Amino acid sequence: MDIATNAIDCIHTTAASHGRVFIVELMGHKVGWLTLHAGIAGGADIILLPEIPYNFDAVLMAVKQRNKAGKRFSILAVAEGAISQEDAQLSKKEYQKKKANSPFPSVSYELGKKIQDALGQEVRICCAGSYAARRQSGCL
């Protein structure tokens, strides 16, 4: 939990100084408790979880509102299993086929591309090492 929280917290300076959108992808293929707690503790602006399919337009609106308020950066904490409302409507087989044919390695990269295309704002993806986040103290 500390590693995931620190990953989000440490990105604030870079995101703010460069006016970027940062997507921090965290563990959570089926459940998003780690992403939720780390997102809150680390100060993420938007948190996407596998349990709640997200609406891309709502995510985009939240980033736009932050920009309009003078906050030229946004940090999204995204669980690796986060899914859009559109994709949640697909059958399991259809969704697996879509993922297999996707040019993106994960949901974060697809989301980042869509945000960058819609806003023209630079987006960076940070995958906060799943293996490091699972470690026991003293292992690294």
Regions found by a protein language model. Give the residues of each.
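Accessory alpha-helical/coil subdomains and C-terminal extensions
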Residues: 1-18, 22-121
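C-terminal active-site/capping subdomain that shapes the small-molecule cofactor and substrate pocket
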Residues: 110-140
